[in-house]
Amino acid sequence: MLKLLENMDVIVSAVPYEFNLTLTELAIKSKTSMVDLGGHTNIVRQQLSKNQEAISAGVTIVPDCGMGPGMNITMAVLATEILDKTDEIYICDGGLP
């Protein structure tokens, strides 16, 4: 996984929250910025405790940005910046149990 991340600028983690701390550590080690959907306060606190390591590695880690609202809106904004013209955006969110 580390070798794969070393070739990326940023990763978006949409996996179950149990993996986010490990992904944070790998992102810092590979000098790859990361954003995730979050889902568990204790995991997020552990990720935030790695802030100085991330700064030293020159990367940004954004934990717990959420799925909706959150990542879905961020991706919609990105799409409007890429497209020549946007009249409307419809966002559907399947939700998680």
How should each PLM-predicted stretch be described?
Residues P16, L26-R45:
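ADP-ribose/adenylate-binding Rossmann-like module
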Residues L37-P63:
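Rossmann-fold NAD(P)-binding glycine/threonine-rich loop
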Residues K3, T24-E25, Q52:
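Alpha-helical segments flanking ligand/cofactor-binding loops in enzyme cores
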Residues M1, F19-L21, V44:
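Short, well-ordered alpha-helical microsegments
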Residues Y17-E18, M67:
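Short glycine-rich anion-binding loops that position phosphate/pyrophosphate groups of nucleotides
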Residues A14-V15, L37, D64, C92:
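Structural motif
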Residues G58-P97:
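Rossmann-like dinucleotide-binding core of oxidoreductases
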Residues L5-A14, M34-V35:
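N-terminal Rossmann-like NAD(P) cofactor-binding module of classical short-chain dehydrogenase/reductase
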